[in-house]
Amino acid sequence: MANVSVYNIEGKEVGSIELNDAVFGVEVNEHLVHMAVVNQLANNRQGTQSAKTRSEVSGGGRKPWRQKGTGHARQGSTRSPQWTGGGVVFAPKPRDYSFKMNKKEKRIALLSALSSKVADNKIVVLDAFNLDEIKTKKFAEVMSNLKVDKALVVIEGENKNVVLSGRNIPTVKVSATNEINTYDVLKYETLVVTKAAVEKLEEVYA
């Protein structure tokens, strides 16, 4: 089991915690991690892009000039792709990019991502994360105290003050333990997780 330091919101070390290898020490499955990230991005795509092919563009029914004798290259329609205002070759159409991943694969991918953060020493454990008021400045001070810039902050449950205080910081995302996913864990440089959140993750996944 990995033993990591525990800090308070002032950035001072206040103890240590042993992380369960079943959650934070698994062998990284790169294939499933990649698959989970692609799945997350694909499922988030709107898929609403659309353009018209030559058969869908209005007009162009009349041949622009006669076939021979003009000196111009032969043309059959002003709506063919090489014309301004013409249709698009292989025009994109609205489609659903999402695909399914089974729960076991998602679980392995998430645990692989969490374990990679521990292996790379990119995890910071907080004894607790509580703010008396909704204040972005206070949240930023905590990140500064921990010497953290780009971070996914994982809390054990609902904490309105923390969530709303961190919302305006573009390099930070706050998530509850039941909201985290492989993509977010890997996207942010550092994983900041409360002690209670660690216990919750180990309870669910160990």
Swiss-Prot record:
GO terms for molecular function: rRNA binding; structural constituent of ribosome. One of its GO terms (biological process) is translation. Residues 44-87 are annotated as: Disordered. It comes from the Bacteria. Pfam families: Ribosomal_L4. InterPro entries: Ribosomal_uL4 (IPR002136), Ribosomal_uL4-like (IPR013005), Ribosomal_uL4_dom_sf (IPR023574). Keywords: Ribonucleoprotein, Ribosomal protein, RNA-binding, rRNA-binding. Belongs to the universal ribosomal protein uL4 family. One of the primary rRNA binding proteins, this protein initially binds near the 5'-end of the 23S rRNA. It is important during the early stages of 50S assembly. It makes multiple contacts with different domains of the 23S rRNA in the assembled 50S subunit and ribosome. Part of the 50S ribosomal subunit. This is Large ribosomal subunit protein uL4.
